[in-house]
Amino acid sequence: GYDSEEGTEIIEKTLKFITNAAYQASATLAGEKGPSPIYDYENYMKCPFIEEALNDQTKQTIAENGIRNIAIMSIAPTGSISNIVLSYKNGNKNYIGVSGGVEPIFATHYTRRTESFKDDNRFYKVFHSTVQAYIDQYDLQSKIDELGEEGDVESILPEFLTRTSHKIDSRRRVDIQGKIQKYIDHSISSTINLPEDV
């Protein structure tokens, strides 16, 4: 899950890769179009972020070409926007929606109600696209339907899918964001969900 040791290692490894790729792209662009006018190699390379986040290959590319962009990495707020992104495609079916930032998904599902003029309103579950893709891939819809409206859907899902944002310990969440920040040179938009008794 997101807050497991393995999850944290994957987060760090992924961000290190993305950050180095972004900085290498900026350095390659500097080789083509010239570095930023305020770029100063000596001072730039002394920056703690550059020293810690970038690998030797990226630093070498910057040394050769300079850097086109002074700051590159940010995790912007994407709450509503995250619901319009194609996250997964399986055959002819598209799954729309991703996590809204550095947090895991907010919930595995929510309940919607259909309005009817005949007073036969119906309730149904709407699953996050990642969860729906899993349900479809492993043919779990009939099991979910058997649970009914009040059934515990999460009981048939793997634990890693049910580690939603409100289940993450707030202190652990801050620790994880600290590890993420190591590879981000601008800001991180983040929501930390706290239990009601805080």
Task: Label every model-predicted segment.
Residues P48-F49, T61-R68, M73-V198:
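Catalytic alpha/beta core of large soluble enzyme barrels
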Residues Y2-T78, L86, I156-L157, I188-S189:
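Internal maturation/activation junctions in enzymes
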